[in-house]
Amino acid sequence: MGCVQCKDKEATKLTDDRDASISQGAGYRYGADPTPQHYPSFGVTAIPNYNNFHAPVGQGVTVFGGVNTSSHTGTLRTRGGTGVTLFVALYDYEARTEDDLSFRKGERFQILNSTEGDWWDARSLTTGGSGYIPSNYVAPVDSIQAEDWYFGKLGRKDAERQLLSTGNPRGTYLIRESETTKGAFSLSIRDWDDEKGDHVKHYKIRKLDSGGYYITTRAQFDTLQQLVQHYSDRAAGLCCRLVVPCHKGMPRLADLSVKTKDVWEIPRESLQLIKRLGNGQFGEVWMGTWNGTTKVAVKTLKPGTMSPESFLEEAQIMKKLRHDKLVQLYAVVSEEPIYIVTEYMSKGSLLDFLKDGEGRALKLPNLVDMAAQVAAGMAYIERMNYIHRDLRSANILVGDNLVCKIADFGLARLIEDNEYTARQGAKFPIKWTAPEAALYGRFTIKSDVWSFGILLTELVTKGRVPYPGMNNREVLEQVERGYRMPCPQDCPASLHELMLQCWKKDPEERPTFEYLQAFLEDYFTATEPQYQPGDNL
């Protein structure tokens, strides 16, 4: 089974030098592609290794979120003798413009130019076609990134969310980078028993100094692939054998296309509004398509809502905010009526989802998990020194599998309507706003924390308006006098205590979103071990 005792000295090794930052990724070296000679060169002569970005040919650099290409994994030799790393498609992709390339999972590519960041100029070695491809849809041939079971930088909580999605059987699994141990991995498996029902168990995969991998020292392997094969054949002490890799959803693209990456103000006629999803004080939200190919959400703002110049300036910042729990801004039409084009979320706003949708049947564990997702997105906004200013369930969007994402961050600052800018006018969300922000305009990340506490009440009451029976003026007066909402029905006291922490009078005494995320993610698991003991296997 490829045990380390009989391993070849030249076996692939995992590098120890790993950067902990989000941008760097795994930092692996790969063995050679066993079949490079089968691919035609299409008459290419002396193509330099563009996978090295701007580095001189022959110097290995880190690409693809940490892939080190210095070993020329799966290399194609051109007539000039230069090796070019081959990449393989992880998903199907349909071209959105005439500049990009449609492809199917399993197709192999030669990368011609990777200087565009999220979009690479590539040639398919399957079809011979050329065009731009999204870089997060491919991985180096024969790398662990190319394995269906490898999920990379995925946190424990997100691993559990994915594994516990509807339709995954017992034995569904994935491997991810360990959050706690540099150079190690985690194996996460969906399990079931009479006491817990469906749940996830985590096993730490450790790395030997000699380059192998093990969960228990009694079974050691040259590669992660061999480890997976071993535990697919037999449980061998795990909760169950590995049955099927967890389904990977399509990765989100940061842009509509390579053309909108930098010039992302688009013509209004490129958008088709198909179905109205909602109607608010300042405009409407539509499901639509861009370029006749790509489903998007379009927020249309009533003329006069905000200055087009101010909006465009703020949108430049919003476009750079990228996180799994933030709705991605794709493009804008900045002439009035302003259009804001974002990723489409299938279940609409969290408020509508809780009041009238599937959310009515959700139990506390799901509601707390949704709160944890919002806290994770806000923790990112906190790290980026940004402020939301209008955090409430109406501005949280819901997708498949109860995924929650934050929308409309930063827009509230730009609204010019007098009924809003007065801060105590009819259109201003007094009941969600911290007193120092409502009274004195002091909006900070700590006033967002106050709003998050109000959002928690919306979750546990399935969308009930905060401070029932009180109007805006009464709320402002009572809160200033120290009134706080009592514990909602069926809400645990510990969760209400968290709300009260968010509503501290002194903003600096309120918790950080980093703390709120950790508290909520561990709300039901704080007494359980994070990892199963490997040496007991």
Curated annotation (Swiss-Prot):
Q: Which CDD domains match?
A: PTKc_Src_Fyn_like, SH2_Src_Fyn_isoform_a_like, SH3_Fyn_Yrk
Show the PROSITE patterns listed in the entry: PROTEIN_KINASE_ATP, PROTEIN_KINASE_DOM, PROTEIN_KINASE_TYR, SH2, SH3
EC no.?
2.7.10.2
Where would I find the Protein kinase domain in this sequence? Answer: 271-524
Kindly identify the residues recorded as the active site: D390 (proton acceptor)
Q: Which Pfam families match?
A: PK_Tyr_Ser-Thr, SH2, SH3_1
Record-linked SUPFAM superfamilies? Protein kinase-like (PK-like), SH2 domain, SH3-domain
**InterPro entries membership:** Fyn/Yrk_SH2, Fyn/Yrk_SH3, Kinase-like_dom_sf, Non-receptor_tyrosine_kinases, Prot_kinase_dom, Protein_kinase_ATP_BS, Ser-Thr/Tyr_kinase_cat_dom, SH2
- Residue positions bearing lipid (N-myristoyl glycine): G2
Regulation of this protein's activity per its record: Inhibited by phosphorylation of Tyr-531 by leukocyte common antigen and activated by dephosphorylation of this site.
Positions of S-palmitoyl cysteine lipidation: C3, C6
**Positions bearing Phosphothreonine:** T12
UniProt-recorded Gene Ontology molecular function terms = ATP binding; metal ion binding; non-membrane spanning protein tyrosine kinase activity
Positions annotated to bind ATP = L277, G278, N279, G280, Q281, F282, G283, E284, V285, K299
Domain annotation SH2: ranges: 149-246
The catalysed reaction is: L-tyrosyl-[protein] + ATP = O-phospho-L-tyrosyl-[protein] + ADP + H(+)
Is the keyword Chloroplast assigned to this protein? Answer: no
Query: What is the top EC class of this enzyme, as a single word?
Result: transferase
Q: Which family does it belong to?
A: Belongs to the protein kinase superfamily. Tyr protein kinase family. SRC subfamily.
Subunit (UniProt) = Associates through its SH3 domain, to the p85 subunit of phosphatidylinositol 3-kinase.
The UniProt function text for this chain reads: Tyrosine-protein kinase implicated in the control of cell growth. Plays a role in the regulation of intracellular calcium levels. Required in brain development and mature brain function with important roles in the regulation of axon growth, axon guidance, and neurite extension.
- This one is known as Tyrosine-protein kinase Fyn
Q: Which lineage ranks, top first, belong to the organism behind this chain?
A: Eukaryota, Metazoa, Chordata, Craniata, Vertebrata
Tell me the name of the encoding gene: fyn
